[in-house]
UniProtKB/Swiss-Prot annotation:
One Pfam family it belongs to: Formyl_trans_C
Domain of life: Bacteria
Family as reported in the entry's similarity comment: Belongs to the Fmt family.
GO cellular component, as recorded: cytosol
Functional description taken from the UniProt entry: Attaches a formyl group to the free amino group of methionyl-tRNA(fMet). The formyl group appears to play a dual role in the initiator identity of N-formylmethionyl-tRNA by promoting its recognition by IF2 and preventing the misappropriation of this tRNA by the elongation apparatus.
Top-level class of the enzyme under EC nomenclature: transferase
Catalytic reactions of this protein: L-methionyl-tRNA(fMet) + (6R)-10-formyltetrahydrofolate = N-formyl-L-methionyl-tRNA(fMet) + (6S)-5,6,7,8-tetrahydrofolate + H(+)
Keywords tagged on the record: Protein biosynthesis, Transferase
E.C. designation(s): 2.1.2.9
Official protein name in the record: Methionyl-tRNA formyltransferase
Keyword Protein biosynthesis annotated: yes
């Protein structure tokens, strides 16, 4: 696809990198890339570039701009001003935004001729905010999707350009759904920019006033399981927090992460929530407030994710032991 549109891109994690790659591979001219500053990561805590920056640098896209803020009146006014001036110098027609992580002030929203288009991983107005994929799985939603939105100054409140639905399967995790939605978002935004280049505009519909929910950022503390809850709810938590931060519970002072599981409808009437009912090659069965959870993939501190059979060889768990509940 050849296009006369000059496209700027703003994004940081892998979800955004997949969209940037789709735009680049479609032949759209990427005239500027914004991404969050390099962060310490890994065991050595060395500075690491974001997936978006890595893709942009390796494919010669840019300039790459990494201001800590885009607010001229904020904590980093000089860095913000320099980035906005550099972006303006590229004269973008449109900016695509995906999981950028910084607030775009009105000045930046107004800078491209056709404004800024956001790729959001939910069916707006449900799950506005930072963690829409996690929250959709955790809540037991039957479906989610991608919404393309004409950005305004609110938090994911802009008019909707396009929407596509994706069912949430019984075994879907945030990781699997992330990959599906990221690829879908890339395809959708490429198609939208093709329409924009052809027609000179993109019709958009205001979001419904009803059905607004917010997807708060995931806190590590949420990973600890509360065994008084129903097994189906705990299974959703395991799926929602895979791959980050990982659902977990303590057993005799050792924090164990749970990566794969299945909900069982029944448990002995006298079983205490958190009690281990069985531990064998098929999994570790733990009593819940209602039903039980069979955990089939586990991880101990400093170890790898392992199927139950291998995990139990290194860290035996026996019926009668009891996992602690989140305080």
């Amino acid at each position: 696809m050849t296009s006369t549109l000059r496209v700027a891109f703003a994004g940081t994690p892998e979800f955004a990198q997949i969209a940037l790659a789709a735009l680049h591979q479609a032949g759209l001219p990427i005239v500027a890339v914004l991404s969050q500053p390099d962060r310490p990561a890994g065991r050595g805590m060395h500075l690491q570039a974001s997936p978006v920056k890595q893709y942009a640098v390796s494919h010669g896209l840019g300039p790459v701009l990494q201001p800590p803020s885009l607010r001229r009146t904020g904590k980093y006014p000089q860095e913000a001003a320099a980035a906005i001036d550099a972006l303006s110098a590229q004269q973008p027609d449109v900016m695509v935004v995906a999981a950028y992580g910084l607030i775009l002030p009105q000045e930046v929203l107004d800078l491209p001729r056709f404004g800024c288009i956001n790729i959001h991983g939910s069916l707006l107005p449900r799950w506005r905010g930072a963690a829409p994929i996690h929250r959709a799985i955790e809540a037991g939603d039957a479906e989610t999707g991608i919404t393309l939105m004409q950005m305004d100054a609110g938090l994911d409140t802009g008019d909707m350009i396009a929407m596509e639905h994706v069912p949430i399967g019984l075994t879907d995790t945030t990781g699997t759904l992330h990959d599906t939605l990221a690829a879908l978002g890339g395809r959708m935004v490429v198609e939208a920019l093709a329409r924009l280049a052809q027609d000179g505009s993109l019709p958009a519909t205001p979001q419904p006033a009803e059905g607004v929910t917010y997807a708060e950022k995931i806190a590590k503390e949420e990973a600890a399981l509360d065994w008084s809850r129903q097994s189906a709810a705990l299974l959703r938590q395991v799926h929602a927090f895979n791959p980050f931060p990982g659902a977990s519970a303590e057993l005799d002072g050792v924090s164990i992460k749970f990566w794969q599981a299945e909900a069982l409808p029944d448990r002995p009437a006298d079983a205490q929530p958190g009690a281990v009912l069985a531990a064998d090659a098929d999994g570790v069965v733990i009593a819940c407030g209602a039903g039980a959870l069979r955990v089939t993939q586990l991880q101990k501190p400093g170890g790898k994710r392992l199927p139950a059979r291998e995990f139990l060889q290194g860290l035996p768990i026996r019926p009668g032991q009891r996992f602690a509940s989140r305080a």
